[in-house]
């Protein structure tokens, strides 16, 4: 009886470990796909962007968002995974040198330090938003 219980618990533990390792590559693959997109498209890296109270964002991967302003879209890369942006509250930079300017390497958004900011065209933003989605997954 104890041997059977030990085998069942071992199998359950292995199944949990296998599930955990299966989830991580998908996230890493999406982040790598965004990095490849930046390299292939040779996106222009910016030092700063002008923000306002009406700005919005869309999470692309754990370390990337598309920051949408009235005039332009930007790809923002964080120094680490930023889970604080998934609750969809209004985006506000935490630390700023200037009121309506967000700077890469210095400012943070909801505790996540901005590593890089890239300028995007409308077509590039649309392509990044669809990254990782299967055909027909949006209604």
Language-model-derived ranges and their functions:
Residues 1-4:
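Positively charged n-region of N-terminal signal peptides that target proteins for export
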Residues 6-15:
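Bacterial N-terminal signal peptides
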Residues 18-77, 133-136:
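N-terminal secretory signal peptides
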Residues 8, 61, 121:
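Residues that line or immediately flank small-molecule/substrate-binding pockets and catalytic motifs
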Residues 12, 49-50, 113:
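Generic detector of short, well-ordered, non-transmembrane alpha-helical segments enriched
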Residues 78-139:
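Helix-rich interaction surfaces within compact, conserved domain-sized segments
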């Amino acid at each position: 009886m104890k041997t059977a219980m030990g085998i069942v618990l071992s199998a359950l533990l292995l199944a949990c470990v296998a599930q955990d390792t299966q989830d991580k590559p998908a996230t890493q693959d999406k982040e790598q796909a965004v990095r490849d997109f930046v390299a292939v498209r040779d996106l222009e890296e910016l030092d700063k962007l002008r923000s306002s109270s009406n700005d919005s964002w869309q999470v692309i991967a754990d370390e990337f968002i598309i920051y949408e302003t009235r005039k332009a879209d930007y790809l923002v890369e964080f120094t680490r995974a930023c889970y604080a942006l998934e609750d969809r509250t209004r985006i506000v930079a935490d630390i700023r040198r200037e009121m309506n300017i967000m700077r890469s390497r210095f400012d943070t958004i909801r505790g996540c330090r901005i590593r890089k900011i890239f300028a995007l065209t409308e077509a590039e933003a649309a392509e990044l938003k669809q990254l990782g989605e299967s055909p027909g997954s949006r209604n």
